[in-house]
Amino acid sequence: MASAVSERLFSLELLVDWVCLEAGLPQPPVVAEEEQKEEGEGASPPRPSRSLCPAVAFRLLDFPTLLIYPPAGPAAPAQESRPGLVSFRRGKSCLFRLQPATLHRLLLRTPLYTLLLQLPPGHPTPAPQLLGACSISLAAAVHKVLGFAAPGSSQSHRGSFPLCNRDGERIGDIALGYRLSDLGSSLLGHLERPVASPGGGVEGMEVQKSVEVSPQTWQENQQLQQPDSEPSPGDADKPLVDVKISRAGKDLKGRAFHSKADSDYTDSMENGKTNSDMCSKGSSERSVSPPNQEGTEVELETNIICPPPLYYTHLTQEKTPPKQGKITIEPQINASEEWDDGTFLKENVNPPTHTNPPEHTNSATGESCSVLINPASVQDTGASNQTTDHPPTEQNRINTIRQLPLLNALLVELSLLYNQPMANPTHIHPHLAWLYRTEDKKSPESSVKSTCKSESKKDKLSVGENEKSVSLQYKKNQTENLKKGKYFEKKGGAPQKRVSRGKLLYGLTNTLKLRLKQTNPDMLVEYEKKEQYKKMQTQMLGAKLRIPSSKVKILSFAELYQKPHELPKDKCLESDASFAENSNTSKQISVVVDDPSTTTETKLNCATEKTVDCDENRSNNGFLGEILSPANSVVSERFICTNTLEGKVFGRKSIQSPGVFQQVAVVDRTVVDKEIDDKQVKITGDDILTVDINEKNPSTSSCSESISELKYSDDFTSPCSSEDTSRILRACDSSPGTENPKNSQHTSTSSETRLSIRKNSSAKSSILSPPFSAGSPVLSHKRFPVSKTQDKSLEEASSSDFSSSQWTEEKENQRDQNSMHNSKVIKQDHDISAKPKTRTGCKSSEKSQSPRTSQVSSYLPSNLSELELNVLDCSTLDHFEEDCDDLGSLNISKQCKDICELVINKLPGYTV
């Protein structure tokens, strides 16, 4: 016997097969000693009862009593297969911890007490009556268990023991079995799941756990080992009631662990001696007519609680999980996936033969990834994706999908994503129906309108058909800008071809229109006239833009300038000169400059700018060809034909544009664009952004800006905003002062250099300054008080409609081309303060305000643009002298550089 110093865990399993009473229910005397052997349940002495309500109690050492009830339960009359025979087939197992030597010593002296009790019915339950008792010695079992060196050994015994009453008279027999096992020093190696450990017992901790064991092994053993006189093995296993074994006594330091379980006897159990004399009759009857097997089977299934298999030498049988309905997709060989029709996975509850897991639908790709595992073959995923269209299954599918709102929503989204209408409207869950609208309700214009409010507003004021005539390139770029709602940097070179999805119209917004009605009705009339003019221009341009690329050079310039009805003679001269310059040398440019010098300042500016552009184009014939190609050529759509590709801006149609807006803006812009390359463009207080021109692609950005501006800049970017309407009117009438030819020539030379620079930088995307917030009334507020010189008003007016839109293009171009013709052009359409080398261009561009800020720019006085201030700082003293008149008009910009300086209260409906 190997005794360990440390405590070890032991298991005692008990199973009661049956109890047989010889002479029926005896008349039990009331004895006080009964209460000593049972857990204290004090009550008045019970009266004898003729109905048998038995219970078997086990006392091991000082641990708590284990009670085992018949299948009917406690205090319930027992079902007797024959008089005096009660079948239990229930048991309990208990765990306790003791030192092996202590356990051996105690079990040698103290047996296992077995008590047969009578539990009379009543509430509260009366004290049980002792019917009989027997003592079972565990000395042999403990000796054998502890005799093995290795833990895990067990010793079991099974037999029939006589029951004696208090007088020592034999009243019957009890058939039971027990097994004592040594589980070693730890329980962790035996349990598969954690055990709750509530405190219990005198000095120990008690742990109750649920365990499972297969009843078949116990039944098999009983069939092999149970004597014929014992009940049939089918009733062997019975669920056992919880048992608490508390250890008391100082010598017993064990901890009792209780578990509900059926005892499973896998080890051979010794056949107990049966008292043939006492139970011969009962045994014979039992052998002839065993208890009802079926009733026992049901009881076993409902009452069995199995302990972990580690307690036994044989593993328990794994329970096969119940077969569950599977959702599968039945592949159809000839069918193809029909997500377009809104068909969904077919959900079938298949018989247990299909054990494949439920299929999953990949909502992201809209494809079913589940595979149906058929007995014969595994279907391909493509086949499994196929769906069936049988009417009954279709209805079931619909019902199933409607019960899964999220899956339904995903499927609906997929169908919408691929423009595939839903086959059945019922697929949409009622709670999600509000998320979806039929596509018919959504017109393509709605998406476009949502992209930009200004676009929708413009649609009301201007005809969309005219817009279509505008070159596709501009429309595509504008569409792109509108969707983003901001002027963004263009990614280089020629404008990318995009599918035009709607009519992009720019002009007065409803808000501005209403404001003009209240503040300046005359200005509103002027705007409407300009819009009509624009429509005519766009129609004419549309026809011209369709001309082949070979003719684009000539037609884009010659035709635009040759149109007499809208172009003054001076303008025609300028346009002709600029065209000639394009094809000819720069000498012609200087000549052209000389010619317009006689004309008004605006006309001169236009001519000079055009000549500069022509010179640049001429110097870079290859570039010019590229620019003029249909894809790359940026013909000024409505008012100004500006070729911004490769950073070149050709302000030709500025001449065509209305007298007020035509000349100055385009020409100046082109020059300024080229000069802006190396310089940082500082946005005015309104523009807010400081951009490095090198980083930005002036050509591309300017192109994008001009595109967006062409339709939209009229109202906002132009100084003719609602507040500046008086200014615009003046601009139309005002005659500009002559511009020095030096500037134009200088810009032309610099422009050529800039062109090469621009080509390099054209690959880069230019970052456009963000548009001014509509809520910044600073610019608009100060426009009214600002008195501008006629030259400025004229420049601003010209830039407002045409140049403003083109200026956005040219601004970007001008950033690279700052050195070329910074003078008036930058002022007019650029709120961004480009540091142009020519002062006049800068001033005009500043006045016109960058089309990027077109929404706010309409409210901004051209004078206020910080661009002008920056330009003034950067411009040479000569430029300042030359542009004294323009500078005089810039006083307002100096007055208000910060939004904090604005008096916003004067603007109705605006708050900061």
UniProtKB/Swiss-Prot annotation:
Composition bias type Polar residues, residue spans: 211-229, 266-295, 735-768, 841-859
Chain intervals for the UniProt region annotation (Disordered): 31-50, 209-239, 254-296, 335-366, 443-469, 730-859
Bias (Basic and acidic residues) ranges: 254-263, 452-468
Entry keyword annotation includes Lyase: no
GO MF term list: microtubule binding
Keywords linked to the UniProt accession: Cell cycle, Cell division, Cytoplasm, Cytoskeleton
GO BP, sorted A to Z: cell division; cytoplasmic microtubule organization; mitotic spindle midzone assembly; positive regulation of cytokinesis; regulation of microtubule-based process
Pfam family, one: HPHLAWLY
Keyword Cell division appears in the UniProt entry: yes
One Gene Ontology CC term in the entry: mitotic spindle midzone
Location(s) in or outside the cell: Cytoplasm, Cytoskeleton; Cytoplasm, Cytoskeleton, Spindle pole; Cytoplasm, Cytoskeleton, Microtubule organizing center, Centrosome; Midbody
Positions with biased composition (Low complexity): 347-362, 796-807
Domain of life: Eukaryota
PANTHER family documented for this protein: MICROTUBULE-ASSOCIATED PROTEIN 10
Subunit text: Interacts (via middle region) with microtubules.
Purpose: Microtubule-associated protein (MAP) that plays a role in the regulation of cell division; promotes microtubule stability and participates in the organization of the spindle midzone and normal progress of cytokinesis.
Protein known as: Microtubule-associated protein 10
Phylogenetic classification of the source organism: Eukaryota, Metazoa, Chordata, Craniata, Vertebrata
Name of the coding gene: MAP10
